[in-house]
Amino acid sequence: MTLSIWFSLFTICLLGAMSPGPSLAIVMKHSLAGSRLNGLATAWAHAAGIGVYALISLLGLAVVFHQLPMLFKAISYAGAAYLAYLGFNALRSKGGIAEKMELGHAVSVFQSAKEGFLISILSPKIALFFAALFSPFVAEVSGLTEKTLMVATPFLVDGLWYTLMTLLLSSPLLLTRLRRNAVIIDRLSGVMLMLLALHILLSVS
């Protein structure tokens, strides 16, 4: 794999990570707790899900989806259901994690990591990204070193991007403003998650 091919891969992964969606909403939700550890756990668990997709892309993800279209539909429906579940909870929330922290009910790092991992592994958008845009790079790699680099690139790009988002969102000045509007943010993220769930259902039906 030449440097130019790797840079193309890096650019595609960065643009994919930067695109707004439910992943950012979940990282934002957990960073609002005031604990960077929660946000970082969400970010790197999300990146772990990205790494899983990168790994199975090496094993022929696009071919699997082509031969087993019901598998992609199953992932899409599961992802839509999970987004709807998160959206419903956000709409009912009275301040989300920030409220729980103020009441003394700390949100565990495991819970943050679990939501981060599930939001990536159950995302049909991410599945399609790897099947359509990532898989073509598989033909350009050979040997363990290049294959390791191919899996590590999207994992690190995603993890570092959401680490940056966590650090920005958990800065004291911004965090104070966000916590004042935690209920509004929860409502907006809830609506966005529900609309994304509906969009996924309509696109695969």
What are the residue ranges of the model-derived segments?
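Alpha-helical membrane-protein architecture signal
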Residues: 7, 11, 106-118, 148-149
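Hydrophobic alpha-helical transmembrane segments in multi-pass integral membrane proteins
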Residues: 54-58, 122-127, 131, 189-205
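Juxtamembrane transmembrane-helix termini in multi-pass membrane transport proteins
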Residues: 3-73, 129-154, 163, 167
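Select subsegments of transmembrane alpha-helices in polytopic membrane proteins
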Residues: 45-52, 113-126, 186-189
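Selective transmembrane alpha-helices of multi-pass membrane proteins
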Residues: 67-98, 153, 157-165, 176-205
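Membrane helix-loop-helix hairpins that form the core translocation module of multi-pass transporters
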Residues: 37-112, 198
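Short, flexible, glycine-rich and Lys/Arg-enriched loop motifs at helix boundaries
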Residues: 170-175
